[in-house]
Regions:
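Positively charged, small/polar-rich N-terminal and surface patches that mediate targeting and assembly
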Residues: 2-119
C-alpha cells in the first residue's frame, strides 16, 4: 500500500430519492468529478408505512433510498460532507445518513494509476 492511500476517503450518503439531482449538482459545484449512485432500501427512525393494494393493507417496512459513494482525497471530505448536508436536508425524519471511511487502495483500470492519482 502506497503512502498516498491514507489520504483517500469514501463518503457514503444514503438520501431520499428525490434529492439525487440536487445532491449531484452540489457535489459538482465543490469539484467532485464522479460518483456512484445506487437504488437501495432501508429503514431507521422513519420506519416504514402501510399501503392499500386491492383492498388489503400491506406494511412496507423498507423505504426506497439512494446510496451515493464518492471517493475523494481526505482534504476534500469536509466540503463534500457539507455539500451533501446542504443539498439533501429537508428537516424531516428520513433525510438520511453520511458515513466516511478510509480507502486502502484505488486503481484506475484504464491507466493503471493508483491511490489518489486514480481518484
Amino acid at each position: 500500500m502506497d503512502n498516498g492511500a491514507k489520504f483517500m476517503k469514501m463518503v457514503i450518503a444514503v438520501i431520499k430519492p428525490f434529492k439525487l439531482e440536487e445532491v449531484r449538482d452540489a457535489l459538482v459545484a465543490v469539484g467532485v468529478h464522479g460518483m456512484t449512485a445506487s437504488e437501495v432500501k432501508g429503514y431507521g427512525r422513519q420506519k416504514g408505512h402501510t399501503e392499500i393494494y386491492r383492498g388489503a393493507e400491506y406494511a412496507i417496512n423498507f423505504l426506497p433510498k439512494i446510496r451515493i459513494e464518492v471517493a475523494v482525497p481526505s482534504d476534500r471530505v469536509d466540503k463534500v460532507v457539507e455539500a451533501v448536508i446542504a443539498s439533501a436536508k429537508t428537516g424531516q425524519i428520513g433525510d438520511g445518513k453520511i458515513f466516511v471511511t478510509t480507502i486502502d487502495q484505488a486503481v484506475r483500470i484504464r491507466t493503471g494509476e493508483t491511490d489518489v492519482d486514480a481518484l
